[in-house]
């Protein structure tokens, strides 16, 4: 297979990947832009619009940081980081269609600007390109389990998403945790697991998985609080409530209710009417549910910090910026809680 099929020049990744010069982000975005649909492609404009706001790119940063810490092949790392980041963005585009969200990263979501058909096609294109990038990472590094590993994580993510739609009744806390872990953790795990495979560090995978499951649920709790308060960037406060989507605050609120009022709430959740949505939103914000979820969020944060402290030093270096980001999100939630 010709070298031109891969990255044309092996670039050295700078040692301070989270420094203010943004070197990792620059290298990654330069590469990512090179593999997006070209100007003549019917999806080019939609792809450019979606990536005009880069987002946090946490999964790509995890992969590139792990690659540097573990001494993995740089070319393989860029291919793998791109695969995971493309899959994450495909899920965002498809989620926005499912959820009816018109805003993504302070811009119009792809479906809102270009229609559902283009958004579906762009998400599908990203999934296809992600597996091509994973195959290239596998070829460069002779790590031929990579594509299977990526496929397994994608299946886990989809299963978590499907659980959200599969519940005839609003989920209890156990079902909610299963949904949350399934939707959030797999692609974080994939980001570093693939690099561990490339670098021959597969002994890290079990503990990495434990960390990211805990971290992912903590982050989801924080996001759920922000959704109810209207500080998550969605077009309207409590969009999860209006869509009857799983949300930790709603789960805890439902548990607080006595049977007669819970039956009324369940009846409303089972319907599709937006009547009384504002009433139930007010009831939720006036209850102790937000504060209970915030307390659980901090317990999860502490647990994640405990797990991260048991990892080898080079792995702690990879996770530290993610842990800092998680703490920042929790602090933002604390500041916005009534």
Task: Please identify what each model-predicted range represents.
Residues 220, 230, 255-258, 270, ...:
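Hydrophobic alpha-helix feature that most strongly marks membrane-spanning transmembrane helices
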Residues 1-33:
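N-terminal amphipathic/basic leader segments beginning at the initiator methionine
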Residues 3-4, 8, 313-338:
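Short, amphipathic C-terminal "tail helix"
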Residues 140, 308-317:
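Surface-exposed helix-capping loop/turn segments at secondary-structure junctions
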Residues 185, 213-220, 298, 302, ...:
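Generic structural signal for well-ordered, non-transmembrane alpha-helical segments
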Residues 24-26, 33-261:
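Mg2+-dependent prenyl diphosphate-binding active-site environment of isoprenoid biosynthetic enzymes
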Residues 100, 170, 228, 263-264, ...:
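Long amphipathic alpha-helical segments
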Residues 264-308:
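Mobile late-domain/C-terminal helix-loop "cap" segments
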């Amino acid at each position: 297979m010709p070298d031109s099929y891969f990255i044309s020049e092996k670039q050295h990744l700078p040692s301070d990947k989270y420094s203010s010069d943004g070197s990792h982000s620059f290298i990654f975005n330069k590469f990512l832009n090179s593999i997006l649909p070209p100007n003549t492609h019917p999806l080019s404009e939609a792809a450019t619009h979606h990536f005009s706001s880069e987002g946090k790119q946490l999964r790509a940063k995890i992969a590139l940081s792990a690659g540097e810490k573990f001494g993995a092949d740089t070319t393989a790392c860029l291919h793998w980081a791109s695969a995971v980041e493309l899959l994450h963005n495909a899920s965002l585009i498809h989620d926005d269609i499912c959820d009816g969200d018109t805003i993504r990263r302070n811009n119009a979501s792809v479906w809102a600007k270009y229609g559902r058909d283009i958004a579906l096609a762009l998400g599908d294109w990203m999934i296809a390109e992600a597996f091509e990038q994973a195959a290239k990472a596998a070829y460069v590094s002779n790590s031929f389990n990579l594509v299977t590993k990526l496929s397994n994580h994608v299946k886990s993510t989809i299963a978590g998403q499907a659980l959200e739609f599969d519940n005839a009744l609003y989920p209890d806390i156990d079902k909610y945790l299963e949904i949350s872990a399934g939707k959030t953790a797999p692609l974080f795990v994939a980001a570093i697991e693939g690099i561990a495979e490339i670098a021959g560090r597969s002994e890290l995978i079990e503990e990495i998985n434990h960390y990211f499951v805990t971290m992912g649920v903590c982050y989801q709790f924080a996001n759920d609080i922000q959704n109810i308060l209207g500080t998550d960037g969605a077009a309207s406060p409590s969009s999860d409530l209006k869509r009857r989507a799983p949300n930790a605050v709603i789960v805890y609120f439902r548990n607080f209710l006595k049977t007669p009022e819970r039956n009324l709430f369940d009846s409303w959740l089972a319907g599709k009417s937006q009547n009384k949505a504002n009433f139930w939103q007010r009831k939720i914000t006036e209850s102790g549910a937000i504060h209970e979820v915030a307390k659980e969020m901090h317990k999860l944060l502490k647990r994640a910090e405990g797990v991260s402290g048991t990892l080898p030093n080079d792995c702690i270096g990879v996770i530290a910026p993610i842990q800092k980001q998680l703490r920042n999100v929790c602090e933002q939630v604390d500041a916005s809680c009534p």
